[in-house]
Amino acid sequence: MYRARAARAGPEPGSPGRFGILSTGQLRDLLQDEPKLDRIVRLSRKFQGLQLERDACLASNYALAKENLALRPRLEMGRTALAIKYQELREVAENCADKLQRLEKSMHRWSPQCALGWLQAELEEAEQEAEVQMEQLLLGEQSLEAFLPAFQRGRALAHLRRTQAEKLQEVLRRRERSAQPAPTTAAAAAAAATAMDPPKPFPAAAVLPTGAARGPPPAVPRSLPPLDSRPVPPVKGSPGCPFGPAPLLSPRPSQPEPPHR
């Protein structure tokens, strides 16, 4: 019964089975009837599925378009802020380049070597100024009251510059010593071994002769003669000095020590 109803209902419009039962003349007439072909295509399931997909895509695109249009003011504001940030970044980069250039010039100008040269030049200038002041004082071109304060200030400045130059030279020497490469391992080990090696003793010196070997000392008289009995030599004095010349004592010859063994 169901098969009879399906046969009576016929195939689905637009399906290949529906066109298969038509004769050649009917197919030729169908090709010439465009409204009928259009109606058949529209009634097919595939076309209806594509139509539904198209409607869904259109609805989705419409929703996305509305959302994008709602975000457009925010996009414009962000674009403007980004342009401002780029401008600020460009200005900061230019300022940074300018400051780096000035910093390099300042570092070159105020380097320790340049500072040392400046101090030495100031010292020479102070010395020359002191010499000029001395010449003016000797020639009478400057009074003593005006010379003393100026000369004192100049000498104080020269002393200060000399001290600064010496300290700076010491700092530069320390930096050069610290920048030198450290000694190698072998050299360091040799230096440590040399430092740890105990010093060798000196050879024993020869024993000096004692008093017994030298002989008995000369006999000293036990009783001295009276002072009146000793002759007093005459004193010869100079007109400017009432006393005579004192006799010079000759050094006692020392015995040479024997060489070390």
UniProtKB/Swiss-Prot annotation:
Bias-annotated ranges (Low complexity): 181-195
Pro residues bias: start-end ranges: 215-224, 231-261
Residue span(s) of domain VPS37 C-terminal: 93-182
Domain of life: Eukaryota
GO biological process: catabolic process; protein transport
Translocase found in the keyword field: no
PANTHER family reported in the protein's UniProt record: VACUOLAR PROTEIN SORTING-ASSOCIATED PROTEIN 37, VACUOLAR PROTEIN SORTING-ASSOCIATED PROTEIN 37D
Complex formation: Component of the ESCRT-I complex (endosomal sorting complex required for transport I) which consists of TSG101, VPS28, a VPS37 protein (VPS37A to -D) and MVB12A or MVB12B in a 1:1:1:1 stoichiometry. Interacts with TSG101 and MVB12A. Component of the ESCRT-I complex (endosomal sorting complex required for transport I) which consists of TSG101, VPS28, a VPS37 protein (VPS37A to -D) and UBAP1 in a 1:1:1:1 stoichiometry.
Protein name from the UniProt record: Vacuolar protein sorting-associated protein 37D
Organism in which the protein naturally occurs: Mus musculus (Mouse)
Gene behind the chain: Vps37d
